[in-house]
C-alpha cells in the first residue's frame, strides 16, 4: 500500500514538474498616449502593445500553448500616468481559460487551458483605467492557442 501511494505521489509530482517546465509566460504590456485618450481618441488608436508596437491593438494576437501563462499589464508613461488592467473578458471565438472573465487591480495573469487549433481564436476585451480613476477604456485583441503544452 505504501509503495502504491509513493508511486502515485511521484507520478503527480512528475506531472507538475513537466507541466511547469514546458509552460511559458507571455506578456502583453499595454502602452497608451494618455493625452490622446483624454482628448477622446479611441483606445485602439491611442494605445499599442509593447511586444508589437506597429500592430493595431485590435489585431494584436498572443500565440500560446496549453499550460502557458499570459500576463497583461500596463506601463507607466514619462508623466507618471499608470495603466491598470481591470478585466479580461471573453467575447467570442473559442474559450481558452477556465472562466469567461477575470478581474484585477493592475495586472492579470491567466493560464491557458484549452486549444483554438482548427477553431476560431479567443477574442476578448481588456478593460483598463488610467491612474485608477475615471473612465474605463476597452480594447479587443485575441489569443491563438496551439495543441501543445
Located regions from the model:
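Bacterial Sec-dependent N-terminal signal peptides
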Residues: 1-25
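Short, ordered beta-strand-loop transition motifs
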Residues: 23, 101-106
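N-terminal edge beta-strand
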Residues: 25-66
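Exposed beta-strand and adjacent loop surfaces of beta-rich binding modules
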Residues: 25-27, 69, 82, 123
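Residue-level recognition of well-ordered beta-strand positions that form the cores
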Residues: 31, 73-75, 127-129
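Short, acidic/polar linear motifs in exposed loop/turn regions
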Residues: 36, 76-78, 132
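Contiguous segments within soluble domain cores/interaction surfaces
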Residues: 58-103
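Extracellular/periplasmic metallocenter environments
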Residues: 104-149
Amino acid at each position: 500500500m505504501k509503495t502504491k501511494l509513493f508511486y502515485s505521489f511521484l507520478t503527480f509530482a512528475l506531472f507538475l514538474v513537466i507541466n511547469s517546465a514546458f509552460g511559458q509566460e507571455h506578456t502583453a504590456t499595454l502602452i497608451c498616449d494618455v493625452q490622446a485618450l483624454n482628448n477622446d481618441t479611441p483606445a485602439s488608436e491611442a494605445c499599442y502593445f509593447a511586444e508589437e508596437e506597429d500592430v493595431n491593438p485590435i489585431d494584436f494576437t498572443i500565440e500560446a500553448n496549453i499550460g502557458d501563462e499570459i500576463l497583461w499589464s500596463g506601463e507607466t508613461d514619462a508623466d507618471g500616468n499608470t495603466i491598470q488592467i481591470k478585466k479580461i473578458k471573453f467575447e467570442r471565438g473559442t474559450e481558452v481559460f477556465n472562466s469567461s472573465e477575470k478581474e484585477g487591480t493592475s495586472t492579470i495573469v491567466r493560464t491557458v487551458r484549452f486549444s483554438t487549433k482548427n477553431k476560431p481564436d479567443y477574442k476578448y476585451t481588456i478593460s483598463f483605467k488610467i491612474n485608477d480613476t475615471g473612465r474605463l477604456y476597452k480594447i479587443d485583441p485575441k489569443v491563438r492557442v496551439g495543441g501543445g503544452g
